[in-house]
Design a protein with these regions (language model features):
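Short, low-complexity, intrinsically disordered N-terminal peptides in bacterial proteins
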Residues: 1-4, 125-127
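Immediate flanking context of iron-sulfur cluster ligation sites
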Residues: 2-9, 33-57
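Local cysteine-cluster metal-coordination motifs and their immediate loop/turn environment
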Residues: 7-21, 51-68
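Glycine- and acidic-residue-enriched helix-capping/strand-helix junction motifs
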Residues: 20-29
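Amphipathic alpha-helical interface surfaces
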Residues: 28, 32, 36, 50, ...
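Ferredoxin-type iron-sulfur electron-transfer modules in oxidoreductases and energy-metabolism complexes
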Residues: 30-47, 68, 79-89
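Short flanking/linker segments adjacent to small metal-binding domains or redox-active Cys/His motifs
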Residues: 59-60, 65-71, 92-127
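Canonical phosphoinositide-binding patch of PH/PH-like domains
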Residues: 76
């Protein structure tokens, strides 16, 4: 595992297609955030999971970002297509692979399928 802290950002305002605006806590993004926090706790993982009000990728809900100091940041979407509990496990799997890299670039063949299909952007490390 990486000694550098990894952060997962989850867009909690993301809505699945046809989903109501209110209540906000029932939106797909909020459900994924809760499922990810729960799955990380159940797995004994000490991960920083941050709820973000909007990541401006509304056409590909739910959007998630993985980042760590000195590493590439990845933005993934399309997690509203699967149950939040399944998406959370996929994200934790991808996160473990991300943490094992020096630069944040998970080799293509090692990425969970949802991280291959769902990649939106890769941003270079800062600094």
């Amino acid at each position: 595992m990486s000694a550098l802290p990894t952060t997962v950002h989850v867009c909690v305002s993301c809505r699945a297609e046809g989903e109501a605006l209110e209540p906000r806590e029932a939106r797909a993004g909020a459900r994924l955030h809760r499922a990810l926090v729960s799955a990380a706790a159940a797995d004994g993982r000490d991960i920083t999971i941050v709820a973000v009000d909007c990541m401006s990728v509304c056409k590909r809900p739910v959007t998630v970002g993985l980042s760590a100091p000195g590493k590439w940041t990845y933005i993934y979407g399309d997690f509203a297509r699967v149950p939040p509990e399944d998406a959370a496990l996929t994200i934790l799997d991808g996160l473990a692979r991300y943490e094992r890299t020096e630069d944040g670039i998970i080799p293509w063949k090692e990425r969970p399928e949802a991280l291959k299909r769902g990649v939106i952007a890769r941003l270079p490390p800062i600094g």
